[in-house]
Amino acid sequence: MEEKEDKHQQHKIEDAAITYVSENEEIKHEEKPGKSIHHSKSHVGRGRIYYAKFINTNARTYNEPFPYIDPKKGPEIQGDWWSHGKALEPVFLPPYDSKSTQRSDFQKPSCPLVLPVKHSKMQKPSCGIVPLASPGTSAELQNNFIEYISFIHQYDARKTPNEPLQGKRHGAFVQREIKPGSRPTVPKGAEVLLNTPGSRSSEQSKKTEKGNSAESRMISPGLCQQNSQELLEPKTHLSETDVRQAAKACPSTPESREKTSGATQTTVGDALFTRHKPLNPPIKKSE
């Protein structure tokens, strides 16, 4: 332990001697300004330090002494970095035209102005700069819009109702125009009676009539000729009503009508002739 203390004392003495020697050298250089010592590092752009002082009136540090060093005294030469003599240039403004489509406040109104009188039915509303809402708006235009909320917030998946109540939803009420094709048509007059549950038979009858008419339109003249040829065969067993319905189904030229009339006579005769003949002839027994 004693050896360590002796070493510490020796180091302190050496440090004190070094500082003492350095102070003496600085004093000698100040006394003899002619002789200068060249240092290895060049100190460029550093002002000469004349004195150092402490600032004791600093409220930020509770008036503790704050070291402050003054730089080299004298006027510093700097370039003119701010132009004092030049005047500011006028700001460019775009040309203003009172006859533009956006501004019509300086133009004369097309209709004569009338002072607005409250609850006056005889006078017309005044035509000014501010657009006035015309009271005679039709109800059809108002019904062409649907009102809804623009955006909905406060969605919480952890709660049992995920979305908030209707009255507590955040957003603005916006109107959306209804397209003419998207609106459902309301039945009028007889359509209301036909749409009732008791009018199913009438609907079915209309559907069958429409189906029959569509089928009759779709029949081609080639099919009509095939039907007439089938009727001319002697082995067909058709009645007069069936033949007449087939003739009505395929209207054609008067020549074809004559042919069909002759075919009906032959088919009727064949049908009467076949009625007397038995359908199944008796089988002869071999003796």
Curated annotation (Swiss-Prot):
Residues 213-246 are annotated as: Mn 2. InterPro entries: CMIP6. Residues 1-42, 179-287 are annotated as: Disordered. Residues 128-160 are annotated as: Mn 1. One of its GO terms (cellular component) is cilium. Keywords: Cell projection. It is found in: Cell projection, Cilium. Pfam families: CMIP6. Residues 1-15, 25-34, 203-212, 232-245 have a biased composition (Basic and acidic residues). PANTHER family: RIKEN CDNA 4930505A04 GENE, SIMILAR TO HYPOTHETICAL PROTEIN FLJ40298. This is Ciliary microtubule inner protein 6. It comes from Homo sapiens (Human).
